[in-house]
Amino acid sequence: MEGSAYTERTLSIAEALHARFPGLVGTVIQAYLHRSDRDLERLIDLKMRVRLVKGAYAEPARLALQRPSEINEAFIRLMERLLEAGRYPAIASHDPALIRATRGFALRMAIDPGRWEFQMLYGVRRDAQLALAREGYGMRTYLPFGVDWYPYFARRIAERPANMFFVLRQLMTR
């Protein structure tokens, strides 16, 4: 999902498509937006697939959490709700702490790894992607393409600058 200016329109379009093509449409929730708890409940009620991300756009404090610790707390809260009630949710993060929190919660709650998946950007933390897949977790690697692939990729790097080191290391080890 793009910036907050598009959130309501994106969700409305996703809901309309989901009504027409049930089970074939999903959308993204950005954990850092203040509205995300309500949006997530709406999507769970509709039984729509949801991909959870932290959120990567500069948003004002009136719309979004600003502190990384608060964003992580929101991500974990939403992740737990999604794993409990979601329809094959996607937990999209490269953050080792959030991956550990997700694995730990799923294990404590006996939520089968076949009911959800991790998602990561192509070229970022490939070692973690392979390890998660070997451990039996669903692992989807996504690759931006088209005319706007580079701005999308740059936002992922800006969201977590350490990702650039992961990408560079992957390029150097090939």
Model-derived features with residue positions:
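Positively charged, amphipathic and often flexible ligand-engagement surfaces
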Residues: 1-174
